[in-house]
UniProtKB/Swiss-Prot annotation:
One of its GO terms (biological process) is positive regulation of abscisic acid-activated signaling pathway. Binds to PYR/PYL/RCAR abscisic acid intracellular receptors in an ABA-independent manner, both at the plasma membrane and in the nucleus. Stimulates the GTPase/ATPase activities of Obg-like ATPases. Mediates the transient calcium-dependent interaction of PYR/PYL/RCAR abscisic acid (ABA) receptors with the plasma membrane and thus regulates ABA sensitivity. The keyword Magnesium does not apply. Ca(2+) 2 binds at D22, D27, D73, K74, D75. Ca(2+) 1 binds at R21, D22, D73, D75, D81. The gene is CAR8. One of its GO terms (molecular function) is phospholipid binding. Residues 1-106 form the C2 domain. This is Protein C2-DOMAIN ABA-RELATED 8. It comes from the Eukaryota.
Length: 165
């Protein structure tokens, strides 16, 4: 991947109150897309509150590019049913990457991000310093569906020899 500035690790933790698509339940999985990159979690059978705890890693060459999360109900014989989508707003996360972490103690809050029309946050999100890393936990409100949220955590991974953004 040309002009790689780093990697974005997305830990897809769990789904909350996802819609039922198959007889009072669903078999959900998540697809994360950024540009031409498309990654997916494993499916969880018979759950509207799945625990994925899967890590997906995207190569980032443009920090302003959109990251989309889509939830689907896995179907064996027909096309997968959409269960909602959300935009992952990574701009506030990238803006704090230049923070000097040498003086930070574990658990230090670097920034708060409030829900707005510019993001899909279901509640306020905190960017924190934890165990030598800058992390952001988010609960995303799914769009284009009756109900559902997805809890994720993002982490920046520096790539040796990459240029600063």
């Amino acid at each position: 991947m040309e002009n790689l500035v780093g990697l974005l690790r997305i830990r897809v933790k769990r789904g909350i109150n996802l819609v039922s698509r198959d007889s009072n339940t669903s078999d959900p999985f998540v697809v994360v897309t950024m540009g031409s990159q498309k990654l997916k979690t494993r499916g969880v059978e018979n759950s509207c509150n799945p625990e994925w705890d899967d890590e997906l890693t995207l190569g980032i060459n443009d920090p302003n590019q959109h990251v989309t999360l889509e939830v689907y109900d896995k179907d064996t014989f027909t096309s997968h049913d959409p269960m909602g989508d959300a935009e992952i707003d990574i701009k506030p996360f990238f803006e704090v990457q230049g923070t000097d972490i040498q003086e930070l103690t574990n658990g230090t809050e670097i920034r708060r991000v409030k829900p707005s029309g510019d993001n899909c946050l279901a509640e306020e999100s905190r960017i924190i310093f934890s165990n030598g890393k800058i992390l952001q936990d988010m609960i995303l409100q799914l769009r284009n569906v009756e109900s559902g949220e997805v809890e994720i955590q993002i982490e920046w991974i520096n790539v040796t020899g990459s240029s600063d953004f």
